[in-house]
Amino acid sequence: MPEFSERSGCGAPAEEVWKLLHDPDRFPEWWAGTERVEPGDGGAVTRYLDGWPDVPMPTAVTSRREGAAIVISCLRSDIVHEWTLEPAAGGCAVAVRVTIPDEEAARLEPVRAEVRASLARLVEVAHAAA
């Protein structure tokens, strides 16, 4: 399975970033291409993307104590985003590891571009909220 990682420093405390990552209602504030999020079935949420308002993307959001990770998984494509936060001078470090199933491998570069834009926006929004 293809995978990649991205990392950025953030001038906000980890708690501010955690709030954005853990609250699906706030995804449109920072997740590139996300138009809106609605409650889904069984604790999942449904993301709707810019330009694709009629294509639901069921999404699971879970947190793991070990590694202090938030895992956001698209239940349609099985693309998994694992976000981790670490304390750093003046704020925190934000890292994301993305795993793409072989069936979706052709989407590697578009997903990487989306993640880079999302990470930059996440850091910006968290910093503004701090």
Question: Which residue ranges define each predicted feature?
Answer:
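Short, low-complexity, polar/charged sequence segments that are solvent-exposed and flexible
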Residues: 25-29, 38-39, 65-68, 90-94, ...
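Hydrophobic pocket/interface hotspot
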Residues: 17-21, 27, 45, 61, ...
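A structural signal for well-ordered alpha-helical scaffolds and beta->alpha junctions
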Residues: 14, 54, 112-115
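Membrane-targeting and insertion segments and their boundary/processing signals
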Residues: 1-4, 8-11, 55-56, 92-96, ...
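Glycine-rich portal/gate segments that line the openings of hydrophobic small-molecule binding cavities
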Residues: 28-32, 36-80, 129-130
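Beta-strand/loop substructures that line and gate deep hydrophobic ligand-binding cavities in soluble
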Residues: 71-128
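Hydrophobic ligand-binding cavity/cleft-lining segments
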Residues: 1-40
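A short, structured loop/turn motif at beta-sheet edges
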Residues: 11-15, 62-67, 85-93
